[in-house]
Amino acid sequence: MRIGILGTGNLATALATGWARAGHDITIGGRSAAAAEAIANRIGGTARPVPAVATDADAILLAVRWDGVTEMLTAAGGPTGALAGRPLIDPTNAVEHGVGVLQTEPARSAAEHVAALASGAHVVKAFHMFASQRWATPDASPVTVAMCGDDERALDVVGSLVRDVGGVPAVLGKLDRVRQLEEVAGFVIGLAFAGVDPRSAIPTLPS
């Protein structure tokens, strides 16, 4: 699969590495052309300017900080339909650093904001619950990757990419449920910064 990655940070690097290892063709671009080139050289991928990253991509990953989402999607041509028809993976967490409180408008999710800026793209919320290093190296114990999205084919594509890096995809619903999923991420982040293992706050199911 041809995957276009928008961003050059830790998550972009980790998923690019994992997907390249699984045999996918990776194209990457970001605000720093030098950073994109360095990642591409490391994984055997291709670096391109941001407007060209999604040109022939089968799926696109938006891996930037929340405050860079609008700038990146605009540069990639999202508002003019340049990403239309493809799965657009949104792993962003629109939360206050170290606190976990959502910074989006009430009743609006980060993924809905992404969808509004990416005309015609099939947005799938995924990869927003675990730290980037979880995806950088293979792990014998798979983790569940909760996902939301409106397009069944896009969910299938992203689900296969989740499996390629050692995750187990779990579709929780359409984008009208995604704010709930983002609130859970905020809860986990808040606990982690408070020095509490978030796993200890989730009840185990009876056997």
Please name every model-derived segment.
Residues 84-87, 92-137:
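Rossmann-fold NAD(P)-binding glycine/threonine-rich loop
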Residues 1-42:
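NAD(P)+-binding Rossmann beta1-loop-alpha1 motif at the extreme N-terminus of oxidoreductases
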Residues 40, 44-89, 93-98:
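Rossmann-like NAD(P)-binding element
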Residues 28, 47-49, 171-172:
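A structural preference for short, hydrophobic beta-strand core positions in alpha/beta folds
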Residues 134, 143-207:
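Active-site-lining helix/loop region of Rossmann-like oxidoreductase modules
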Residues 14, 18, 117, 161:
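Rossmann-fold NAD(P)-dependent oxidoreductase module
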